[in-house]
Amino acid sequence: SLFEDNAEFGLGLRLAADLHTATARKRLEELRDELGDETVDAILDAPQQYESELSQQRARVDALKSRLDSMTGAKVEDLRSVADHLLRRSVWIVGGDGWAYDIGSAGVDHVLASGRNVNILVLDTEVYSNTGGQASKSTPLGAVAKFAAGGKVTTKKDMALQATAYGNVYVARVAMGADPQQTLKAFREAEAYDGPSLILAYSHCIAHGIDMRKGLDQQYAAVASG
């Protein structure tokens, strides 16, 4: 999203998902006598950090729903309606650098400070791409862009450094064209991290004046040049 409410909406989705999960866990606990300790504890205590663990939890929830189909009662219906929320929900907030570094920076900071399990992906073109490629807070020192024909005279805002100040935020910088394996590793680590994460992804753009068919090559060159 370009707009300044992107982070707030994403955090709202996280809060809603957490509320649904808390409700589902409560409904499951209410049926402990009918379902048995083994079934209830297996679901409530299951780790859900990695894909393999999520697959196992998905199988448990499917088995639970099958059992609920053979049961009746108001509590059964209540649990059936929220059973899918026993699976961990992944929330990603995706936006550009104009949003994250500038118009929506306060919202991004609020999300990171919340400590909630929310992932933020910033597609960083280092210019205001949506309005024609003007120099921005994300533009590096010396880079030539609109409104900076002689080279930008100030440095790029270090958003990664700001995020690390909280001490509990997963932070990564990636460029798929420079190192696809590191990019994949960062996404997996951010997804598995139980807390806020921030990935700053260098992104090529038509505003760079390049042949877009060679965008990944340009990413490699940008990283290699420092």
Give names to the regions the model predicted.
Residues L2-A42, S52, H85-L87, T139-A192:
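Conserved thiamine diphosphate
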Residues S1, G107-V111, G115, Q134-V144, ...:
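Short secondary-structure boundary/capping segments
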Residues N117-I120, V144-A148, P196-L198, V223-S225:
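Glycine-rich loops and low-complexity Gly/Arg-rich segments
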Residues S1, M71-Q134, V171, G177-D194:
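Thiamine diphosphate
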